[in-house]
Amino acid sequence: MPGIKVFGGTVLQGSVRVSGAKNATTKLLVASLLSDKRTILKNVPNIEDVQQTVDLCRALGAIVDWDKQAQVIDIHTPRILLSKVPPQFSCVNRIPILLLGALLRRCPYGIFVPILGGDAIGPRTLHFHLEGLKKLGAEIIVSDEGYWAAAPDGLIGAHITLPYPSVGATENLILASVGAQGRTIIKNAALEVEIIDLIVFLQKAGVEITTDNDKTIEIFGCQDFYSVEHSIIPDKIEAASFGMAAVVSQGRVFVEHARHEHMIPFLKALRSIGGGFSVQENGIEFFYDKPLKGGVLLETDVHPGFITDWQQPFAVLLSQAEGCSVIHETVHENRLGYLSGLAKMGAHCDLFHECLSAKSCRYSTGNHPHSAVIHGPTPLQATHLVIPDLRAGFAYVMAALIAEGGVSKIENTKMLDRGYTDWLGNLERLGAKILTEKTRCV
């Protein structure tokens, strides 16, 4: 689906069921490669990133049965058939880098991963991944073509302190530590709910692994694995995205299966600007309650802070909130470029290289525009936009739904297919009027 036309002035009403978490599903598929045992995953989202990961696992030797209607994947990998990841998988997303940690136990003489692709939100260095793997005893070679890792003598448990609680590095080191001899302790680890889901999965598989409140994870190497049946947690990013779309359109949407305990920082921020929500037994209802009030500081952070993937759609809310609000992006150094699209629609957005917060972040001395000031409320005008990345894509669709002046043309919507199950159908069922290039106007 290369492009869509979105009619403005839409009020979203109804209900939507949130899917399984993208950022959990893809990592659990990689984790299934740790052994030759059978894994059954339930509540699997039908999105492009999962399809790409399934195809990657199949290329490596996995036998996969994916019942998309039942949302169930049955996977087991008797043998690893390739030690070099085909380049077509590395250019799509960053999942293949986790194979360095996941496959060193089964392929000790070498795993090669080509240079990575993914969202255009900054370099996202792999230094933390590679240095951690070295501490476990891996040999690492970095070239212009990609990353090579080997552990011919096996991995040995170690004490690792991450300079920054990187989600990807934490996942990679957990997977590698499962195949190491002895005990590994990872300090300053990321503890996002998707990582906790990975830990729960590994415990079911027979791994001895625990966490502490001080961001410490302890793992004992495992040789005997069990088959696992596991239901994936709901996607907190998808849930928040539809919640924000409901509020900004001045509508009311019940997001089934949204978990309050996974979304506390988001719900706090939403309430701080006047957005309405009601936590119910099987989900959260989001609604427009009163005119939105800005004057807030939105600062992204690792768990338990306000996660970076909520930031872009939230900026659309701030463009409709009265007052001057500040966004301080501390996770990715180049995640505010999408604001040029909102500015094209009429939003008042100013970018800054400085940390516009009492707290300086790791980008304070770099030449990265990682802070923004948004003045609102500003009527948005329909225009032509090209989606730069997944979450910016949903932000653009939100903005187009409330735009004045007719129809917005949005291109590169395939980005949305990476992370939102049937996003177009869900929006249309909520009342959005969206035409694809294959849709004929009557």
Swiss-Prot record:
EC category name: transferase
Domain of life: Bacteria
Sorted UniProt keywords: Cell cycle, Cell division, Cell shape, Cell wall biogenesis/degradation, Cytoplasm, Peptidoglycan synthesis, Transferase
GO molecular function: UDP-N-acetylglucosamine 1-carboxyvinyltransferase activity
A GO cellular component annotation in the UniProt record: cytoplasm
Residues bound to UDP-N-acetyl-alpha-D-glucosamine: 94, 309, 331
Any one GO BP annotation for this protein: UDP-N-acetylgalactosamine biosynthetic process
NCBIfam families on file: murA, PRK09369.1
Stated name of the protein: UDP-N-acetylglucosamine 1-carboxyvinyltransferase
Taxonomic source organism: Chlamydia muridarum (strain MoPn / Nigg)
Gene: murA
